[in-house]
Amino acid sequence: MEELLKELERIREEAKPLVEQRFEEFKRLGEEGTEEDLFCELSFCVLTANWSAEGGIRAQKEIGKGFVHLPLEELAEKLREVGHRYPQKRAEFIVENRKLLGKLKNLVKGDPFQSREFLVRNAKGIGWKEASHFLRNTGVEDLAILDKHVLRLMKRHGLIQEIPKGWSKKRYLYVEEILRKVAEAFGESPGKFDLYLWYLVKGKVDK
């Protein structure tokens, strides 16, 4: 852990303004966004699973509110055009998730751990990591996003022995708690800490 904290201290000053700016955007979306805005963000998180944040951002710009109203085949075609690896399946997930429209604002404002579990149980294409990602991107600070970049860092620094092949609730919460302790030692919430980790790995602050 000490070596990771040293690496993070080296980039703290240059990363902090970018992290704070990005988190303000997240909070604004959570506080001022419409149900449709929040649904588009949930769809972004569905798309980034087994793809990339860059691809998800590109799709979000191209499709916009189409996530809310496009017919299934049109949405699948749009995802094909932006190069998604699984356009048909992801389009099916997004269309099925439209049943959650009207519930998202309450989830963002509710208890983050209960909201995350609700999404894991009720949203298609959303697991523990993706639910954490959505809630963090709407201004929730308490959850860790355990993606492959973060897990590789944790393994390299001896925080975990191996990268999990899949997530049960128990396993996710266990690894999240390890990362939470590192975030606390760094003086940041898990949600913001993730952005510092991204900056360390990628040299930029994505969402």
UniProtKB/Swiss-Prot annotation:
Keyword Mitochondrion: no
Domain of life: Bacteria
Catalysed reaction equations from the record: 2'-deoxyribonucleotide-(2'-deoxyribose 5'-phosphate)-2'-deoxyribonucleotide-DNA = a 3'-end 2'-deoxyribonucleotide-(2,3-dehydro-2,3-deoxyribose 5'-phosphate)-DNA + a 5'-end 5'-phospho-2'-deoxyribonucleoside-DNA + H(+)
Site residues, Important for guanine/8-oxoguanine distinction: 207
Keyword Hydrolase attached: yes
Pfam families: Ogg-HhH
Residues forming the catalytic site: 129, 147
UniProt-listed GO biological process terms: base-excision repair
Family annotation (Gene3D superfamilies): Helix-hairpin-Helix base-excision DNA repair enzymes (C-terminal) (1.10.1670.10), Hypothetical protein, domain 2 (1.10.340.30)
Transmembrane segments: none
Gene Ontology molecular-function annotations: class I DNA-(apurinic or apyrimidinic site) endonuclease activity; hydrolase activity, hydrolyzing N-glycosyl compounds
SMART domains: ENDO3c
Its job: Catalyzes the excision of an oxidatively damaged form of guanine (7,8-dihydro-8-oxoguanine = 8-oxoG) from DNA. Also cleaves the DNA backbone at apurinic/apyrimidinic sites (AP sites).
Family from the record: Belongs to the type-2 OGG1 family.
Record-given protein name: 8-oxoguanine DNA glycosylase/AP lyase
Underlying gene: ogg
